[in-house]
Amino acid sequence: MSYGWYHGNITRSKAEDLLSQAGKDGSYLVRDSESVCRAYALCVLNQNCVHTYRILQNAEHQLSVQASEGVPMRFFTNLVELIEFYRRENVGLVTHLQYPIEKEEEGPEEPDEEQEPAPPNVPPRNFAFTPPSETKECQTAIERAPAANASLLLSETLLQRFQDTDSRCIPEEHLQAICDYFSLHIVSDCDMVRTGSQTLPQFKKLLMTLCTGLHRELTRTLPTLESLQVAIDPQLSPGFKQRSPLPGDSATNNMVNKLTHLTSMVSNLEEKVKTVLMEGAAVKHRRSLIPPIIFEVKADSIGISQKTHLKVDVETGKLIIKKSKDGPDDKFYPSKKILQLIKSQKFPHKLVIVLETEKEKTQRKEYVFADSKKREGFCQLLQQMKNKHSGQSEPDMLSIFIGTWNMGDAPPPKNITPWFQCKGQGKTRDDTADYIEHDIYVIGTQEDPLSEKEWTDTLIHSLREITSVEYKVITTQTLWNIRIVVLAKPEHAHRISHVCTNSVKTGIANTLGNKGAVGASFMFNGTSFGFINSHLTSGSEKKLRRNQNYFNILRFLVLGDKKLSPFNFTHRFNHLFWLGDLNYRLQLPNTEAENIIQKIKQQQHQELLPHDQLNLERRESLIFFQFHEEEITFPPTYRYERGSRERYCYTKQKATGIKYNLPSWCDRILWKSYPQMHILCQSYGCTDDITTSDHSPVFGTFQVGVTSQFVSKNNPGDSGDLEAQGHIELMNCKATLYTKSHTKFYIEFHSPCLENMVKSSEAEDQEGNNGTLVVKFGVLPKLTPIISDLEYLLDQHLLICIKSSDTDESYGEGCIALRKEDTEQQFPFCTILTHHGEETGLFCGEICLPASGGKQREKLYDFVKIEKDETVAQKQLKHPYSQSMEQSRIMKSISEKSAMIARMRAAPETQNSMDHTASVAAISSQAKQSPPTTPPGFRGSEPRQKPGSPVQGRGDTPITSPPRTTLSTQKFSHSNTNRTAPAARPQDSLQITVPSDPHEMVDNPLYGPVNNTLYPPTA
């Protein structure tokens, strides 16, 4: 479809932006519907409001504009006919169609700078051969038979093809033999074929020349293997060895037979050895157990610091206190007596251990470790001990390893275990934590040259080497050379279900798989996980295209519960991890390359990170909105000289000149979790001894909270009484939407604690002002949970989706945690609304939980706490939500919204992780910049000004953005930070192919069966 007014699958907010920029009543465009497959949406501007009409297709493929009840339907054969009809006045629309909004023309797609041409650009070898035209044999053949011209052409073609191949690994004598065949002897074989012969004597002669060494080795190796096989399997018949030897002639068939025999023998031999080993006495390796580990600490007693030793015996479940390392045990505490570990925030070496004494009283013991890494290792071992001896049948906490590595199209080295042990630079694990294996490993690779089997075998072997655990492959997904592998401990296999995989191409024309993403998702008991491994467009100047890659992946990757498909992708999982070669670069002039190198050598990473494109884009909330990233304390992972980590190669000779690749943090790990879900990043760094690629592997480890399938302790007979079950009530709810649309709204509620989706009635009242619409909802339906136990409900979340009554399209989705900080039954809430990764508004109100029995159980991850320090807290960034809400309160001029924000700030949703943004300092000693006023990745919900738009569009209130001090020198000048809304960003990549794999989505039993009546039928 090539009509200028048809914009394909652009988002609703993008359509509103385009109409706002036009600013004329009667402006219109057509886009794909976001709610109904194979339907369209006609968007019309009238009096600064956007009206959207759904265009449906019936069984006869006729099109019609969805009309109100009682209005006759008009049918059209195509969109052009429909548009021409509604260009007339007074035919049913709010205004007639006058000014089509033409689709933005996209520039030609440039090949990716890292995409190597195929075949490899290897200069041809100078072969010594005699051209066919100079040989008497060929001259004679040409003179005698005109048909030999075809043989000559074939000879030249094959010879040219062979010259274009990479022949660096071929021996000289083999090169000469192949060239002689192509230039001389192939003509003889051609003559044989034309005369009806079934043999190729010259080609067989060539094969035997090339395989002389192979034949000799086969003759020598077979008897040895046969003897070994007899030793392993003595039941073989005595005549076995006499049957194996084959005639010693040099025929091709003989060699093929020997190869077949050798292949069969090696395969059978390996299986027999496995059987012998499995039947032998299985002795579990000591590495599968955690040995007792001793920490040297200082104990504060009455103001006196004394050296002492803490011995952690995970296997026996004891914490032993000793005065000397090799001395006797002075006192020990079983795991049940260790109540709490409290980390000091002000002093990173200090730890308080809360113990239960004999008289059921508590005692606090304060210790100072050698460094913060030792303290963290001690806490992880104690946490492991508590988990091991808790007596719980199901875990409520997992340890997850996330790894990403651009392999650079090179095979990995033999030893990659430092990657999985988090050895290298950055926030790494202490040596004492080496014995703690992770529950789940998620490995993402880019430019991976290995097959799936080769790579998974390598991973399993490496993990077995360091843990002695035979990890189970849960799933793999590969898009060309982008791959994700998920492995888990064998004991977790039955807890993992609903595994999904999918991929999205974002490469050249969005069809080639050279760039894109692969994803995997699954349920772990009652908790949903999603993982995305992406390889985005490269090139420092292609930041906008990378941003578009991100939105395409977010919009078109199909994973998770299919009943949550109306929701933003980031709302479909309790925990979502995004990893890969994101390819965001340092936004600095190429002339600063050497200064950058010096800053890296001096480990002054915090002076470079403010210029990181990903941080800059997240600070403006243009991408990865509400995602988190651990503080980066490791050097840039790209572009190294292969074989070493001592030197960055920041220049590359191209046909157009020298190309600069400044050292950059291309390889990243980010995450987003539901509010009040426990997640803690325990390490984030890169290796420094895996050098086969120009990228360094990056690792991250996470402690993640999970929920189990809940079993109510109440009388099962009570569950039939709905009144006794109790309800979840939402009251005084308002939604503030950043939209110019003129429509009515309703809410859909989704949750694992609800049997089915619940739909509200239309909102009672709404008012708009400057592209912001405040929608007030009256009495909302009471939500009946499947289980009313408070212990169960406090682990649940409520997903809300605000939809248009006219088109059933979403205007924003949010997540509300039912866990609260106090004991009040009724408490306020406020959640940010997003759609397709962009912020679209706020939803605030009050929620009341049923006053049923039960209380919240202490979670194992609550065993380790952080003692807050006010002086430290003041130096750190404010909480992302409170920071965002504070900006909203300042920026918004609407009194109702200010009241809602103030109420939200009284009870913020807390997170376990916080974005870290270092103090901004320029590379040059003369250039200084103040710390940013907002953390990266979070923007207040203030309306955003769109310059050049004659109509006040979505969020066009003329308000100045928060002040930011800029760099004082031109060579470090930033790009303009007063950006437009994300929806108005230039689309610099072609339309993406929408995945058509609905089978990848699954029914989640926690949500009940899919109700097909929720969605209109498609033609």
UniProtKB/Swiss-Prot annotation:
Comp. bias intervals (Acidic residues): 103-116
Q: What is this protein called?
A: Phosphatidylinositol 3,4,5-trisphosphate 5-phosphatase 1
The answer to whether the entry has keyword Cytoplasm is yes
UniProt gene name: inpp5d
| Any GO CC annotation of this UniProt entry | membrane raft
Motif: NPXY motif; annotated at 1004-1007
CDD domains xref list: INPP5c_SHIP (cd09091), SH2_SHIP (cd10343)
Subcellular location per UniProt equals: Cytoplasm; Cell membrane; Membrane raft; Cytoplasm, Cytoskeleton
Q: What is its EC number?
A: 3.1.3.86, 3.1.3.56, 3.1.3.36
Phosphotyrosine modification, residue list = Y1007
Q: Which GO terms describe its biological process?
A: immune system process; negative regulation of bone resorption; negative regulation of neutrophil differentiation; negative regulation of signal transduction; phosphatidylinositol dephosphorylation; positive regulation of B cell differentiation; regulation of immune response
UniProt comment concerning the protein's domains: The SH2 domain interacts with tyrosine phosphorylated forms of proteins. The NPXY sequence motif found in many tyrosine-phosphorylated proteins is required for the specific binding of the PID domain.
Role: Phosphatidylinositol (PtdIns) phosphatase that specifically hydrolyzes the 5-phosphate of phosphatidylinositol-3,4,5-trisphosphate (PtdIns(3,4,5)P3) to produce PtdIns(3,4)P2, thereby negatively regulating the PI3K (phosphoinositide 3-kinase) pathways. Able also to hydrolyzes the 5-phosphate of phosphatidylinositol-4,5-bisphosphate (PtdIns(4,5)P3) and inositol 1,3,4,5-tetrakisphosphate. Acts as a negative regulator of B-cell antigen receptor signaling.
Motif SH3-binding 1 covers: 120-125
One Pfam family matching this protein? C2_SHIP1-2_first
Q: Which spans does this entry mark as compositional bias, Polar residues? A: 909-931, 958-980, 1010-1019
Extract the InterPro entries matched here: Endo/exonu/phosph_ase_sf (IPR036691), IPPc (IPR000300), SH2 (IPR000980), SH2_dom_sf (IPR036860)
Residues of the region (Disordered) are: 103-133, 909-1019
Listed under catalytic activity are:
a 1,2-diacyl-sn-glycero-3-phospho-(1D-myo-inositol-3,4,5-trisphosphate) + H2O = a 1,2-diacyl-sn-glycero-3-phospho-(1D-myo-inositol-3,4-bisphosphate) + phosphate; 1D-myo-inositol 1,3,4,5-tetrakisphosphate + H2O = 1D-myo-inositol 1,3,4-trisphosphate + phosphate; a 1,2-diacyl-sn-glycero-3-phospho-(1D-myo-inositol-4,5-bisphosphate) + H2O = a 1,2-diacyl-sn-glycero-3-phospho-(1D-myo-inositol 4-phosphate) + phosphate
Q: How does it sit in the membrane?
A: Peripheral membrane protein
